[in-house]
Amino acid sequence: QFKQAREYFDFTDMIEEYILRGEDIPLDALFIDEAQDLNFLQLRMKEKLQENSVQTYIAGDDDQAIYSWSGVDPKHFIKMQGDVINLKQSYRCAKSIHKIAMKIRDRIKLKRDKTWEPRPEEGKIVKHADLYFARETAKGNWIMMGRTKNICKRLTSFCREKGFYYATRYGNSVSEKRLTALQTWLDIQQGELISLAALNKLYFYIAPKDRIARGKKEQLKRYIKENPSAKKEMVSVEKIQSDWGLLVNTEMSWFDLFTNYPHEDKLYLDSLLRRGENIFGKPRIRIETIHGMKGGEEDNVLLLMDMGKLAYDSYKQGEDDEHRVWYVAVTRARNELHLVDPNSDWGYSI
């Protein structure tokens, strides 16, 4: 009724509409990837498409079926009929990571019978009693994972305290707007030409008092709004001072200049620069839940072994779902896997 009243038609409605009234499509071949994640409705769509396909190719891994909470039943994939090709060689996981993955997989009761081999490199498993003992995270590229969004907050706090540049599903730990403002000031200090669009972003973080002439900050905003092409207009340091009211000496540090920048965030940005983090490039650390990182991989992976109470109860009852989740987690690592002991009574044990 809610959708009907507002004339909403979502993705689920599209699938239902195709199943009920969609035309049969003659196909030479149908390809389905990640088939272990198909829910009941998507399986019905698959069956309808498959009826009119000469050949069907289905790829998936039941050990990575971690979306039962959204209506996915791994049994459908496990019981699928057809000629099976088992891809036996991993080009990601080193030996030590393969070993721990197999230990978890052995706990899964309902599964297809299959084996796969690791890369020839040995790799490394490191266990830490506490997150702050993981000193290796100071260098290199990392995936850091927690079982839930709430648990992942520990990882973001850790990275901010350490001065590490990271990304989450919500974006980079320093926004593009803030980086543009910083880069603009650094360019001004070097005497380079600056676009008015960049200058406007810089002025956003500067309180006018004693730093920008009265009214010039708002004048710049209006000028750009009324003249869209003005965004690309390039101006010199002298022009910025004479026409756009910059009052401070260009030798002033960005830290002192950015008076409209939250102090805690300034301290974090300062620590990034002091550590030599490449803040103008791609963050070297990605923080995500295990479910959110499915499909990802990295040379180095750090995994918090904490669990929420609901997940822990499922784990203690011996349900396969939770073992599959942790199997997915450890197999994100190519070379090094760092396991951090839980700091609560609810943790997964390997």
Where are these regions (language model features)?
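Conserved helicase C-terminal RecA-like lobe
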Residues: I188-V340, S344
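Long, charged, helix-prone linker segments
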Residues: W346-I350
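Helicase-core coupling region on the C-terminal RecA-like lobe
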Residues: M102-E136, M145-K162, A167-E226
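A residue-level signal for conserved active-site and pocket-lining positions in enzyme catalytic cores
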Residues: M14, I97, A329
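Flexible, charged surface loops at secondary-structure boundaries
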Residues: E23-L27, A134-G140, T331-R332
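Conserved helicase motor core of SF1/SF2 NTP-dependent helicases
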Residues: A29, Q36-E122, K139, I143-F158, ...
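Accessory N-terminal region flanking or inserted into the helicase ATPase core
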Residues: Q1-F31, F40-M45, I58, S68
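Flexible, surface-exposed loop/gating regions in the mature catalytic domains
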Residues: Q1-R6, D10, Y18-R21, V84-Q89, ...
